[in-house]
């Protein structure tokens, strides 16, 4: 199981460290917007690395880039939860974790497209309408996509996440 609480603390501390080092003076609303834009780009990078939607020129997923962009997306989603004071939405109990890890893997083009678009839809609803339940759905879908669909293990995710944190 992922240690979501630890990951959440790490990304918050990293943001504070970078803010201090760079002397960033960004207001809270602009900060949320910036995190959200960065999250959107990370999700697109994740889809690019996975490549499931490339039907004209199909290719194998770039597992290294996929893992890297996946953990960036996870980190930004966690950071956004902190900015919105929605951290209670990202902590998982054993039952929620089991539902995610035991979910049927999506392998068909339409299923993967739908999952990706649902994440984007739910995140937009969370951002523009402040819908906490939409945010929770996006979070669970993102975890399911990485763990069930792409078979990323919690150890792989944790290690890549730690490497991302350590690079700063």
Identify the role of each PLM range.
Residues 1-168:
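Flexible "arm" and connector segments at domain edges
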